[in-house]
Amino acid sequence: IMIKDPDLDDFSTEEAAELFDNIKSDFHQLEDAIASDQFPNSNYKNYIDIQSLVKFLIVFDLTHNMEINHPKSTYMHKDETGKYFMGPIWDFDWAFGYEGNRIHFQSFNTPLFKLITPNSKGYYFFTRIMEDPEVKALYKEIWQKFSTESMEPLLEYVDFYSAHLTESQAKDYQVWS
C-alpha cells in the first residue's frame, strides 16, 4: 500500500506508523472479505463502491490496460461513507498494445486479466470480484448504456483531440523512442 493523502511526512514517526497501520488494516478487511469462502455473500460491498469499480473495469477493458494485473498505479479513495472508490484513473503506458509488437490488439481474445507474474495481485483481486453475479450484471448494464449512448461521443472526442496532439506526439516519440 502506498498512501498519497494524507502525506505521512506531515506526521510524527509514531503518528505516521499508526495511521499507516490503520489504513493497511482497513484495506486488509476488504481483501479478506473478497477472499472469503462466503464470497460474494461476504460483506465486501460494505468496503467498496461497486459502481465505481465496474466503471473502472470498463475503462481498463476499453483500453486493454494490462496494468490492472499488478496494479502499482491504481488509485482508490474513500469518501465520507467509508467505502473505497476506484479512481482517478491514470498510468496507461501498459494500455493500447503497449508492447512494440502490439500483440494485445492482434488477437481479439487476449484476456485482460492475465497472470503476468506469480505476484499479480490485481489479477486475483479483480477476477475474484468478477465472480460476483451482481458485479457481472452491473457491468453488463453500464456497458450497454455506455455503448449505446456514449461510445460515439467518446470516439468523436478522441478524434477531435488527436488532431491537437499530432505535433506533441511527434516530439514525444523523438524524446522517448
What are these regions (language model features)?
Residues 1-70, 74-177:
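Middle-to-C-terminal accessory/interaction subdomains
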